[in-house]
Amino acid sequence: TLVGLIQSGSSDTKHQVQNATEQARQYQQSGIETADQVRALVKMSEQMVNTISMAASTSFMEVVKLDHVVFNLDVYKTFIGYHTLTADTLSTHTQCRLGKWYYEGRGRDECRGHPAFARLEAPHARVHKQGKDALEALEQQDFARARTALVEMERASDEVITHLTEMEGSHCSHKIG
């Protein structure tokens, strides 16, 4: 009968609507869960970026510290005849890796507000100046002056290392590279 067909059709439609509603709820829940998982992945990715950035900046600082040890060592090796540096061939404080970072690179752009960054310039310049003075004194065979310059170079180098170490643990150092 027509009424039976209508009732059957209505019942079928009701079940289809209920099924569609349930599927919509499931899709909504699935969408919420997916969004939560994506947020968790984004957060984890951000943490990984920060960790990698911190490791890179720490590595950069360690390389810079090592550069200064090598710089000093090269000056000393010249004194004992294992190296042939001259005062004229010694790099300036703006030419070395740290100098480029400080004056031209990301250090200038991202770390100039850090107190240790501001304190770094003078001792870094002194390391290079005293190294040059020591080599000039060696060339002139003025060993007393050379010794004084070497002592001052070491003092300045210690200050540089101290300031780099201070920046290593700061927010600024996460951006170094």
Briefly describe each language-model feature range.
Residues 1-7:
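Hydrophobic heptad-repeat coiled-coil signature
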Residues 8, 12-177:
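N-terminal membrane-sensor/transducer module of prokaryotic signaling receptors
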